[in-house]
């Protein structure tokens, strides 16, 4: 892989640290406080669609669901092999982080009943939104550096559209979607770390020979 395609050394750690801090902050503020739960529920109830509209929107959720995103991520990783096995592995690692993290956190993090009308399980982060983020992360690792800006903008918009769809259908709260974006940051950072791993040793070995 050309050196100019490698990220700045600090970028992966900035993404991982920022995403982790964002996740923690969202959980503490939106889930563990009365005002946070009230705000989250108010946004959800304001944007939630009526039954007729929800029935029309539901097929879109299936069309862009986690299974479809996993298949697309696998295709992106295979395409990444053309740029080296570390690039393909990095794309896969970033996607796996995005796909697995929401399932673990939803089980591990409790949601206290502070402002909810009835006891509810924790739904932060959204698995559907994180699945879209997984595809974006894989693409951000695989595509050339010159194309990453466009992928980042379009990918962020795609995550936002999926998030709005989930809120409109009443499946997730706003904080769940924001948390998925943070998971995406962590996944991207992880993918970049894996992609860049061993590059220093390769350069040193080439120089020595």
Annotate each PLM feature.
Residues 1-12, 170, 198-203:
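Cytoplasmic juxtamembrane interface segments
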Residues 2-119, 140-141:
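Hydrophobic alpha-helical bundle signature of multipass membrane enzymes
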Residues 116-209:
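Membrane-embedded catalytic cores of phosphoryl/pyrophosphoryl-handling enzymes
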């Amino acid at each position: 892989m050309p050196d100019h395609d490698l990220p700045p050394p600090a970028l992966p750690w900035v993404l991982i640290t920022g995403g982790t801090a964002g996740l923690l902050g969202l959980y503490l503020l939106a889930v563990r406080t009365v005002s946070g739960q009230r705000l989250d529920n108010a946004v959800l109830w304001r944007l939630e669609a009526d039954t007729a509209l929800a029935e029309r929107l539901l097929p879109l959720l299936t069309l862009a669901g986690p299974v479809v995103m996993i298949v697309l991520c696998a295709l992106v990783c295979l395409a990444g092999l053309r740029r080296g096995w570390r690039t393909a592995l990095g794309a896969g690692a970033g996607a796996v982080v995005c796909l697995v993290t929401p399932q673990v956190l939803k089980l591990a993090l409790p949601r206290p009943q502070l402002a909810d009308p009835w006891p509810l399980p924790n739904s932060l982060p959204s698995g559907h939104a994180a699945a879209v983020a997984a595809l974006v992360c894989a693409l951000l690792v695989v595509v050339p550096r010159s194309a990453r800006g466009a992928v980042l903008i379009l990918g962020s918009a795609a995550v936002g559209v999926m998030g709005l769809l989930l809120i409109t259908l009443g499946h997730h709260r706003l904080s769940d979607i924001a948390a998925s974006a943070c998971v995406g940051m962590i996944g991207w950072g992880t993918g970049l770390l894996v992609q860049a791993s061993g590059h220093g040793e390769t350069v040193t070995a080439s120089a020595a020979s």
